[in-house]
């Protein structure tokens, strides 16, 4: 395992490439890299270019309303901020939710996880590997044979089915309006799939569109709508009535519960017979594409998720923990309350602290904007052509765990769960690695394969399988508990602020689709005194700190060779593997800031 470079060791010579803007769930991102004469990335700079500011907006508001504000941080991972927020308030006020509410929250959270991962792979990430135009050259009969070889259990596998998909795609291309497929790099040699694999992937792209719109209906049953389903401090905002179908004010009945079960089975079939086989098929063809490990080979963090027994974190299906220095033999405990463990630094962020060599725990966090550019910045304040990363260069703060920059997300969760001995995860990972090695003729070990762009993408698919499988357990437990006579969905004993202490503080944690998510709150006189959120993109998109430690995005891009630097497919592959939501124009710049080309990131 190579050592993790410090910012002071990075080679900042060579050609500078700028990708801007890169739109993500927390705002807009910018990425700059230096490439050497061999087109290998030697320096990477990740910049957050929009200030969220919700922490400031929340001050002085009713903590029972915080979830509705913070939920708007993101419209893709909808609901996860609301869930984390109500957990923070409940922690501060010592509120325990009913068992039904725990199960319903689990179902809503896992629905999000499944939906988000499927949408990510097929509609955000797949086009970094799949060439839809090349699918026009495919033989539908050969595509059918490939589908049956890759996943014989999938029903949609006939030559006629793939011929119909190809015909639809051909009409689309011949219209001259490629839409979401326009501005791609379809002649770039970085694309290696045969036409039949491309056609199969395009068919699954369309199937995933149908699936994603159906599974989120679970949110409308339990949360009233999607996106941004309703939550509440003390439980969930939905009543239960199994006696009268469609009873007013009681959306949870056996008809709606059976509808939920049908959606779970559909997602389970798709994950097992389409999503996972597709990821392994892509990995098998791109078997040498093991770039993008970065921090994953060194430092990983998870708060734990999918708690089976309420308020018992030891029952998390994916456990909490931290790995430092690539030591998988030791998973360290994580305490989000400890001011020595989690701190945010701002020496390279557009914020101001009294002492910028020291970090602040979120309970004591300060959000004071200070936008200033370093002296070597090229361009102007409103049109930056090249950032000066030696100074402040991002609206994202720099969170650290015991001083270390950490990678968070599905890959972190899976490596930590594997190292912690979770049998379900070990079986999944071992099975997948064996399939990869068998299909490629390689003999890679876990540490060679998992800490990579491909490994990060596989971990997300495996987590989708775990989530949808465990949804069946939650559904059965919920129905069983209701039939046993328990109809409670909320604990309102402390709803009235007159029952609250004069001052209180709490923390809510969750594992959002993209990684570790924490909300820290201080309440005084019934109002929010301070609120801080550290989101997954803050961890992964962190700028450097005062000691030169680089973040997950920056580290993952290093040492990647690009086929054509003016068509940065490789940059997008690795950035997308962290599950950013990208649909914006990007620009590739020469060292003097002149635009070379304009592309669309899909």
UniProtKB/Swiss-Prot annotation:
Entry GO CC: plasma membrane
PTM summary: 15 or 16 residues are removed from the C-terminus during maturation of the protein.
Compartments where found: Cell membrane
Catalyses which reaction(s): H2 + A = AH2
InterPro entries given in the database record: Ni-dep_hyd_lsu, Ni-dep_hyd_lsu_Ni_BS, NiFe-Hase_large, NiFe/NiFeSe_hydrgnase_LSU
GO molecular function: ferredoxin hydrogenase activity; hydrogenase (acceptor) activity; nickel cation binding
Cofactor: Ni(2+)
Enzyme class label: oxidoreductase
Protein's UniProt keywords contain Oxidoreductase: yes
Residues given in the record as Ni(2+) binding sites: 74, 77, 581, 584
EC number in record: 1.12.99.6
Pfam family, one: NiFeSe_Hases
Keywords: Cell membrane, Membrane, Metal-binding, Nickel, Oxidoreductase
SUPFAM superfamilies: HydB/Nqo4-like
Membrane topology: Peripheral membrane protein
Cofactor binding notes: Binds 1 nickel ion per subunit.
Functional note: This enzyme recycles the H(2) produced by nitrogenase to increase the production of ATP and to protect nitrogenase against inhibition or damage by O(2) under carbon- or phosphate-limited conditions.
Subunit structure: Heterodimer of a large and a small subunit.
Family designation: Belongs to the [NiFe]/[NiFeSe] hydrogenase large subunit family.
Protein name: Uptake hydrogenase large subunit
Lineage: Bacteria, Pseudomonadati, Pseudomonadota, Gammaproteobacteria, Pseudomonadales
């Amino acid at each position: 395992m190579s050592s993790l470079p410090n910012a002071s060791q990075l080679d900042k010579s060579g050609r500078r490439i700028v990708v801007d803007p890169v739109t993500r769930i927390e705002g807009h991102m910018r990425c700059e890299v230096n490439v050497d004469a061999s087109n290998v990335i030697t320096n990477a700079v990740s910049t957050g270019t929009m200030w969220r500011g919700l922490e400031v907006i929340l001050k002085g508001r009713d903590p029972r309303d915080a979830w509705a504000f913070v939920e708007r941080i993101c419209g893709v991972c909808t609901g996860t901020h609301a869930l984390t927020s109500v957990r923070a308030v409940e922690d501060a006020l010592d509120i325990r939710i009913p068992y039904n509410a725990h199960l319903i929250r689990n179902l809503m959270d896992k629905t999000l996880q499944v939906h988000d991962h499927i949408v990510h792979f097929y509609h955000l990430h797949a086009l970094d590997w799949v060439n839809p135009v090349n699918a026009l050259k495919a033989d539908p009969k050969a595509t059918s044979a490939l589908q049956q070889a890759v996943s014989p259990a999938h029903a949609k596998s006939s030559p006629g089915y793939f011929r119909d998909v190809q015909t639809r795609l051909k009409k689309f291309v011949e219209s001259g309006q490629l839409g979401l497929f326009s501005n791609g790099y379809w002649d770039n040699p970085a694309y290696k799939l045969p036409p039949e694999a491309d056609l199969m992937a395009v068919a699954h792209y369309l199937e995933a569109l149908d699936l994603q719109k159906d599974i989120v209906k679970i949110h409308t049953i339990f949360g009233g709508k999607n996106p941004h389903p309703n939550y509440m401090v003390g439980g969930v905002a939905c009543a239960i009535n199994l006696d009268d179908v469609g009873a007013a004010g009681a959306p949870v009945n056996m008809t709606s519960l059976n509808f939920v079960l049908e959606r779970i089975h559909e997602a389970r079939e798709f994950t097992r017979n389409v999503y996972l086989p597709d990821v392994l098929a892509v990995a098998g063809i791109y078997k040498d594409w093991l770039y993008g490990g970065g921090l994953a080979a060194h430092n990983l963090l998870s708060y734990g998720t999918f708690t089976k027994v309420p308020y018992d974190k030891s029952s998390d299906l994916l456990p909490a923990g931290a790995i430092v220095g690539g030591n998988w033999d030791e998973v360290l405990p994580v305490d989000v309350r400890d001011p020595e463990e989690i701190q945010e630094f701002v020496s390279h962020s557009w914020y101001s602290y009294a002492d910028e060599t020291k970090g602040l725990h979120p309970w004591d966090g300060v959000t004071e904007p200070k936008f200033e550019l370093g002296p070597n910045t090229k361009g102007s304040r409103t049109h930056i052509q090249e950032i000066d990363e030696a100074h402040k260069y991002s609206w994202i703060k720099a969170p650290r765990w015991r001083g270390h920059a950490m990678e968070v997300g599905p890959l972190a969760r899976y490596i930590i769960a594997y190292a912690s001995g979770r049998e379900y995860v070990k079986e999944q990972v071992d099975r997948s690695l064996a399939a990869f090695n068998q299909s490629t003729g390689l003999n890679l070990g876990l540490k060679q394969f998992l800490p990579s762009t491909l490994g990060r993408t596989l971990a997300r698919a495996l987590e989708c399988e775990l989530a949808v499988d465990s949804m069946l357990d939650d559904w059965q437990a919920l129905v069983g508990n209701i039939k046993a006579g328990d109809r409670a969905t909320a604990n309102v004993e402390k709803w009235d602020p007159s029952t609250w202490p004069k001052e209180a503080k709490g923390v809510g944690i969750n594992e959002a689709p993209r990684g570790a998510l924490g909300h820290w709150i201080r309440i005084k006189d019934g109002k929010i005194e301070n609120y801080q959120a550290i989101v997954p993109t803050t961890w992964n998109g962190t700028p450097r700190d005062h000691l030169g430690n680089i973040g997950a995005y920056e580290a993952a891009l290093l040492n990647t060779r690009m086929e054509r630097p003016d068509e940065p497919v490789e940059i997008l592959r690795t950035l997308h593997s962290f599950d950013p939501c990208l649909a914006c124009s990007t620009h590739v710049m020469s060292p003097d800031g002149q635009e070379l080309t304009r592309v669309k990131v899909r």
